[in-house]
C-alpha cells in the first residue's frame, strides 16, 4: 500500500497496482511530470513500476526500442493521449489501446465556457471534444467513471467499447466496520 500519494492520481495508482498484482510489467511516463520526482517516483519504483523519465530516458526513444513488446497501452486523460498518439501508432502497433478518460474533459470545458460566457473557452472545448471523441472512437476500450458518461458517449455520439469503471479508492485508517461507526 502507499502512504504518501496525495498528489498522484489515485485511479492511476489503483490501475497500476491492479496490473502489477496480475503479473503485468507496468511502465509509467507522465507528460506533465517527465522528470524524476523525488517524492513520487520512488513510490512507483517500490511498486515495481518501471518509470521512464528524463534525462536518463526520453519516452520516444524508449518506445522506439521497446514499444513492439507492449501488449497493452493504458493512457489516462485526453491531453496525455493526444500528446503520445503518434508515438503509440508508430511504435506500439500490436498493443491493445485502453483510453481512460478520467472524466470526459470536453463536457467540463463546455460547462466552464457557459459559466464564464467565453467564446474562447467554448472554442477550446470544441477542439477538446473533437480530439476526445476521436481517441475514444479509435481506442480498443474507453473507460469512464460514471454511468451518465457511458450513456452520453454511447447514445449521443454512438461510440462502442465504453466501459464504466467507477473510481476505486482504498480507505485507509478506518476506525471499525460500517456497523461500528453508525
Regions found by a protein language model. Name each.
Residues 94-95, 99-127:
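Acceptor-binding helix/loop patch of EC 2.4 sugar-transfer enzymes
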Residues 26-68:
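Conserved nucleotide-cofactor-binding alpha/beta core module
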Residues 91-97, 159-160:
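A short helix->loop->beta-strand "cap" motif at the edges of active sites that frequently abuts
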Residues 133, 137-154, 158-174:
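Donor nucleotide-sugar binding/catalytic pocket of nucleotide-sugar-dependent glycosyltransferases
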Residues 64-83, 96-98:
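Short N-terminal targeting/anchoring amphipathic segment
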Residues 77, 101-103, 146-148:
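Helix N-cap/beta->alpha junction signal
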Residues 1, 143, 171, 178-182:
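Conserved donor-binding/catalytic core segment of Leloir-type glycosyltransferases
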Residues 1-35, 41-42:
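N-terminal subdomain of nucleotide-sugar transferases
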Amino acid at each position: 500500500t502507499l502512504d504518501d500519494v496525495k498528489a498522484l492520481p489515485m485511479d492511476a495508482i489503483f490501475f497500476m497496482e491492479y496490473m502489477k498484482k496480475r503479473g503485468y510489467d507496468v511502465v509509467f511516463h507522465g507528460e506533465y511530470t517527465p522528470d524524476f520526482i523525488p517524492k513520487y517516483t520512488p513510490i512507483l519504483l517500490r511498486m515495481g513500476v518501471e518509470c521512464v523519465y528524463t534525462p536518463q530516458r526520453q519516452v520516444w526513444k524508449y518506445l522506439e526500442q521497446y514499444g513492439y513488446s507492449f501488449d497493452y497501452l493504458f493512457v489516462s486523460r485526453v491531453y496525455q493521449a493526444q500528446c503520445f498518439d503518434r508515438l503509440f501508432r508508430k511504435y506500439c502497433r500490436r498493443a491493445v489501446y485502453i483510453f481512460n478518460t478520467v472524466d470526459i474533459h470536453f463536457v467540463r470545458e463546455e460547462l466552464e465556457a457557459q459559466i464564464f460566457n467565453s467564446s474562447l473557452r467554448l472554442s477550446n472545448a470544441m477542439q477538446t471534444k473533437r480530439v476526445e471523441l476521436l481517441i475514444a472512437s479509435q481506442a480498443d476500450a474507453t473507460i469512464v467513471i460514471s454511468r451518465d458518461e457511458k450513456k452520453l458517449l454511447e447514445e449521443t455520439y454512438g461510440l462502442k467499447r465504453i466501459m464504466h469503471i467507477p473510481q476505486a479508492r482504498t480507505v485507509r485508517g478506518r476506525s471499525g466496520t460500517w456497523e461500528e461507526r453508525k
